[in-house]
Every structure is written in C-alpha cells, then in structure tokens.
Amino acid sequence: MASILPLDTLNTSRECALKLLEEASEACEALKKHDKLNKLGTYQDALMELADVEQCVCNCLQVMGTNSGDWEDAVAEVRKRNIERGRHEVASRRTFMVEWRLYDHE
C-alpha cells in the first residue's frame, strides 16, 4: 500500500488550506484535460495531481493534530451524509483507504 507522510514545510492551518486549494485546482484542471484528450500523458498528470491533493490532506491532518478516532468519525459522518443525500457507494473491488495512525518511523 502506498503511504504518504506529512511534510515539514507547512506549519499552520492557513498554509495547509491554501496549498490544498492550489493542488485541488490543479487536479481539477488535469482531470478536465484528461477527460477531453484521454491520453496516457493526461492520465499520468491527473494521477500525480490527485496524489498531491492527498499529500495536502495528510499535511492538514498533521497540522490540526487530528487523531485516528476523530478521522474515522469524520469519514463515517461523511458516508452517512452522502447516503442521506442520495449518494451511494459503488460496489467495487477498489477502495480508497486513508489510515491515519501514529507510527514510529526510524
């Protein structure tokens, strides 16, 4: 499983929020370009931008001091709200998992 560790360059919630917006905008543009051209290069660009967004999410969770229980509660609440809004998960073998845990990395 691929793992992303927080970066040491963003230290405030504001910095993380701005970087998240920047990367999300770049991901949006890359996805639109891939949707239009549907080429290997545009696919790879979109994938890289999505990974950048996930890096930013990781950084934000770190800066906020989020613990694993709070993260899991937030994800469960989002799932509940999606169901209430008529948005249902697609039965698939593919699952995007974000495990927010404290590990000792040496």
Give names to the regions the model predicted.
Residues 1-106:
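Flexible "arm" and connector segments at domain edges
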